[in-house]
């Protein structure tokens, strides 16, 4: 609820694998924006995750997860304790993630994740942290981050010469574009074969595809949903006359003639529901922001 807590926020990957899961995911998103927003960013707490976890696969996510931050700031024992909390919360719907990044801390974290997989038999998926789509976008991504942090290219060069490269910018050289399976296979062969056993690598790929298929099988109703009115024309007429009486307009005949003419036109175009929906939105806006 304060600046300190905001800085302790962590990442969690949630994947809906059923219609119920999608609804729960929407509920979590809505709650985060309506009740958990702080400094313009939505947040979700453990209580809400427990309440809306059905039909969702959760994973250990990246180095910025609760487990990853515990591993980085405290150590493996604290990270393992966080992992067991997640397993207790999500059960069999909780998976581990390994990533093949050039990020300097990633190999040690992958080793820890594989150790937890061996110890607790939690399935692993293989993912790729993606900050941009194509390899050639790396330079543009770095420039965007410089603009956001108020740095210049010369600032970064000076920091690199001084040996003061920040992880924030180091990540931009960590192969963070969206990769094909062939690219992932090549990366394993050239950089990660001594860290990730081939059988674990293959099993993680299979599990990833399995989860992707489950998520792809969720059928979403994308039709437009609007409030239904049994008799929209009559409802609109009542609201018009109520407003007319409330305003106590002086030249009644002129206004009544105009009301009849415009009301008839609205009904003939079947726009009554539209006006009623607009009235609902205006009323709600006035309720939320009375000033």
Enumerate the language-model features and the residues they cover.
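Phosphate/diphosphate-binding loops
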Residues: 6-14, 122-125, 130-137, 142-212
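Non-catalytic structural connector segments
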Residues: 67, 115, 190-291
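Active-site proximal loops enriched in glycine and acidic residues that flank catalytic Cys/His/Asp
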Residues: 98-100, 126-130, 270
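Conserved phosphate/anionic-ligand binding catalytic regions in large, soluble enzymes, centered on
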Residues: 21, 61, 125-134, 285, ...
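Extended substrate/RNA-proximal surfaces in nucleic-acid metabolism proteins
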Residues: 1-101, 105-121, 138-148, 154, ...
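Short, solvent-exposed loop/turn elements at beta->coil junctions and helix N-caps
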Residues: 1-2, 131, 227
């Amino acid at each position: 609820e304060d600046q300190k807590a905001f800085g302790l926020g962590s990442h969690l990957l949630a994947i809906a694998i059923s219609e119920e899961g999608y609804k729960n995911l929407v509920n979590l998103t809505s709650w985060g924006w309506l009740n958990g927003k702080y400094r313009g960013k939505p947040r979700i707490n453990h209580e809400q995750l427990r309440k809306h976890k059905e039909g969702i696969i959760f994973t250990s996510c990246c180095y910025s997860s609760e487990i990853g931050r515990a591993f980085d700031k405290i150590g493996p024992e604290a990270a393992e304790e966080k992992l067991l909390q997640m397993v207790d919360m999500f059960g069999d719907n909780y998976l581990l993630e390994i990533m093949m990044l050039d990020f300097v801390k990633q190999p040690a974290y992958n080793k820890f994740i594989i150790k937890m997989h061996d110890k607790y038999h939690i399935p692993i998926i293989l993912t790729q942290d993606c900050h941009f789509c194509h390899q050639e976008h790396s330079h543009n991504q770095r420039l965007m981050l410089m603009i956001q942090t108020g740095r210049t290219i010369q600032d970064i060069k000076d920091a690199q010469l001084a040996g003061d490269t920040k992880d924030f910018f180091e990540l931009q050289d960590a192969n963070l574009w969206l990769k094909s399976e062939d690219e992932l296979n090549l990366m394993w062969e050239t950089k990660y074969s001594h860290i990730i056993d081939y059988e674990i690598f293959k099993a993680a790929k299979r599990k990833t595809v399995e989860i992707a298929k489950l998520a792809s099988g969720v059928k979403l109703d994308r039709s437009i949903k609007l409030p239904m009115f049994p008799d929209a024309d009559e409802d609109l007429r009542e609201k018009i006359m109520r407003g007319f009486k409330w305003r106590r307009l002086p030249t009644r005949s002129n206004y009544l003639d105009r009301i009849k003419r415009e009301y008839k036109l609205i009904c003939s175009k079947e726009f009554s529901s539209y006006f009623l929906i607009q009235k609902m939105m205006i009323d709600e806006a006035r309720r939320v922001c009375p000033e």
